[in-house]
């Protein structure tokens, strides 16, 4: 288990890296781009995540933990972006 200081440092680093990624993909003014709807992106990823579970009672489907993990990572990226805009 990580101590609180290490955990905070790792989370801070994740947000810094997300900011770098957003600058690379969306430009240095990404925080002011009103066309980037992070919450819609989160909802979309949530819907995609459901497709990798067996929630559809009309169809037999295997659960894909690898794909679920990828969707959760995508959700985390979009959530960090939204938090950087709405909590700065």
Regions found by a protein language model. Name each.
Residues 1-88:
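Flexible "arm" and connector segments at domain edges
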């Amino acid at each position: 288990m990580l101590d609180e200081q290490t955990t905070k440092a790792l989370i801070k680093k994740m947000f810094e890296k997300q900011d770098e990624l957003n600058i690379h993909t969306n430009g240095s003014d990404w925080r002011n781009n009103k066309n980037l709807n992070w919450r819609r992106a989160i909802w979309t990823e949530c819907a995609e995540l459901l497709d990798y579970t067996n929630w559809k009672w009309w169809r037999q489907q295997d659960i894909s933990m690898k794909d679920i993990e990828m969707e959760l990572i995508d959700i985390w990226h979009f959530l960090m972006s939204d938090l950087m805009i709405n909590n700065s």
